[in-house]
Each structure stands twice: as C-alpha cells, then as structure tokens.
Amino acid sequence: MFTSKANAIFQDVINTYHLINTVDQGFTNVYDETSNLIEHLLYRKCWIDTVQWHYEDIIRDPQIDPVAALTLKRKIDASNQDRTDMVEYIDGYFLNKYAHVTPKSSAKINSESPAWAIDRLSILALKIYHMNEEVERKDASESHIAACQTKLNVLLEQRVDLSTAIDDLLEDIENGDKYMKVYKQMKMYNDDELNPVLRGQK
C-alpha cells in the first residue's frame, strides 16, 4: 500500500532530523529524483514539515528577540510556500500516474486531493513522534505521561484511519470511481500584486 511506504519515509525523515536536531542543519535527499520520484518528493515534503515544526516551537519562546522573531516569521512564510509547492508537485505526480485512466460516468470528486491528504499524514507523523517523546519523558509527572499516552493512542488510531482513506482514494482513482481535480493554491500574502502592504511599497 502507498501509505505504508509514505509512513516509513516520514519516520525516517523525522529520525534523521533529530540526530542533529537543529533547524540550521543541511538537507540531503536520500532518494534520487529520476529513479525514485515519489519517494524523493515525500522525503523532501516531510523535511520541510519537520523544520517548520521546530520553527513554530522557537517563535513561541516568550523571550525571543523581536528582530529574530521577525526573521523567523519570514522563514516560516517561505517554508509555507515550499510546503504548498511540494504538495502541488506530489499531486502532479499522481495526475501523471493516472492520466491514462478514464473516469466512469458515475465517478465523483474527493473533497481534497491525494497530496493534501498526504500533507496531513506527514504532519500526523510529527505529532506522533513528539507526543511519544512526552510519554517517554523521565522528568514528567505520572498524570502528564498518562494524559499524553491517551493522546498518543488517538493519534495512532488517526494515522491508521487516514492511511486507509488515502489508500482507498488512490485505488478509487485508479479504478475510475473517483477523479482528480487539482486547484493551485492562491497564496496572496507573498504576492506584491495581491498583498496591499507589499503593493504599496512598490
């Protein structure tokens, strides 16, 4: 199943990031873009998510320097754009993969594209990793650990359900029971023609 591969890649990315555990570390994609395109895209996608997860931790530091916070906010904006771009690349992969499929006359569209569901699966992998860290903390109270274990159990169940839904969606598309229709994300805040503040500075 597709999500078995995706979940394994996400876990590998998150484990690799935490070997050094800094947002400034270099990135190396272990999958070749030519011979392993979808693996390459999934690996890059989860790396972007993982770095941004830690950006979001840092910017919530109440003692953060305001200048550093502004710099970090712009990094988060850029990361969000990279994340969106990667989702669109992944959807492009599936559009190409299933281009030969003729949808049935009864085919329906899904509420989200495969790649946006995969985006949620990547974020879910990060939630599971960090919730598990809380469960394994030696300095935490028993009540904290118990509460986090309950949350972890829900997250693990959610991953099973989301993985099943994604695999079912891909199967439905392959069989012509559903069809893909992808909309470009109309990001406005980084566009100097659409953001009135940026437009006023031109």
Can you describe what each PLM-predicted range is?
Residues 1-202:
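Anionic, Ser/Thr-rich low-complexity intrinsically disordered regions
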